[in-house]
Amino acid sequence: MTRSSQILAIRAGSLFDGERALGPGMVLTQSGLITGIDTSGAPPPADSLIHDFGDGVTVMPGLIDCHVHLSLDASPQAMANVAVEDDDVLLRRMELASTRALHAGITTVRDLGDRRFLSLRLRDQLTQNSIPAPRIVAAGPPLTTHGGHLAVMGGEAEGADELKAAVHMRAMRGCDVVKVMVSGGATTPGSRPHDAQYGQKDLHLIVDQACKHGLRTAAHVHAVTSIVDALEAGFDSLEHVTFFTAYGVASDQHLIEQISQSGTFVSLTIGSVPDSGKPPPAIAQRLEQIRANAARLCSAGAKVVLGTDAGLSPGKPHDVLPYALEALVDLGMPPDRALHAVTAVAADACDLHGLKGRLAPGAEADLIAISGDPLKDISAVHNVVAVYRDGHLVVDRRLKTETSMTA
C-alpha cells in the first residue's frame, strides 16, 4: 500500500495511547505515520481529511498478538494438516488467517512457528500485492530436537554446528526472531511438556548466535526446568510459562519473582473462544493451576504480553485475541494494564518500540476504533468498527468523513 501524503485527522470521544487514557481527542497522520495527538479541542489542520467517529468510540493503537501460527488452520487436525498440505494451499490459508486477524483489530502478529519459512513468503506476497494484513514478525520453523516438539515444521537441529547453522539460516532468510522449543509440548506424539529438550550449553549458544545476528529469541517453556534454563540463558521472551513437572503444575513463587525481576517478556497463551471444546488433555487437566500461576505472574509485575497460540485448535482461531484480553482481566489485571500489554508492551516484545503499539509522533499509523470504552468494559474490544494500517483505512464498519476547510 502506498502511503498518502494528505493529513488525516481521526477524531473520537476517547483516546488510549498505549499507556493511558487521554479523553476526547484527535490523532493526526500523514504518509503512514502518526504526526500528532491533540486533546485540546482545536480544529483539524486546513484541508485535512477528517474521520470522525464521534462520542462512544475509543481510538487506540492496533492490537498485537505475540504468539500465532498462521500456517495452522484452527481445526482439530491442525497439526496433521500442516504436515501434508501443499505450500500454495497453506499460503492461501495463511493469507485468509491474516485477514481474519486484521478484521479483529490485530495489526501485528508474531508468528512463532511455520513450515519451511512460509510466513516470510506470505509477508513478501502481501507487500508485493498491496494486500492489507497485519505486520508479520516471523520466526520461521522453530528450533527443536530431532523428532522433538513440532519437528514436523522442519526446524530440527542439535549440537553446536547444527544450531549455529540454523540460527545463521534464519538471519539470512530475513527472520526477526529465533523460536526454540526448550521443552516438549502437548500436541506432538511422544513429546511431553514437562520434559526439557535442550540443555544449558545449547541454549547459551543459541542466544549468543541470535544476538550476533541481531535477532530476538523466544523460548517455548512448559517445564519448570526449562523455564529456569531459558531465563538463565537470557532469552528475550518466555512462551506459555505453565510450570509443568512430571507430577502436575508447580507453584513456585520464588521462580515467579525471578521472572518478574528479570524484565524478560512473558507471553501468556491464554484465552479461547467459549464453548469451542477442550484444550489438549495435558493442558486441560491442569488448567486451573496454570491460570493461578498466570495470575501470580501478573500480580508480581512480570512483563506480560498476550500470545494466543492462534491456529492451534478450534478454540484458537486467528481472531481470538479479544477473548485473551478478557481472560487477562479475569486473572486480575486492570483493563488499562491489559490494553497496555497488547499494545505498547507487546510492541517492545516484538522489537518494534517506537514503531508500533503507541499513539505517539513518529509511530506507524496502525490504529483501531472500538465502539464503547474497553477501559471500563474490556469486552468492548470485540466491537472493532475501524482498522488502520500504515494510515490506510482497511476495515470500515462505521464512519463519518469530511474535509476540513479551516486553518
For the regions a language model picked out, list residue spans one by one:
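His/Asp/Glu-enriched, well-ordered alpha-helical/loop segment
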Residues: 288-373
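Divalent metal-dependent hydrolysis catalytic cores, especially in the metallo-beta-lactamase
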Residues: 93-119, 133-144, 175-188, 215-216, ...
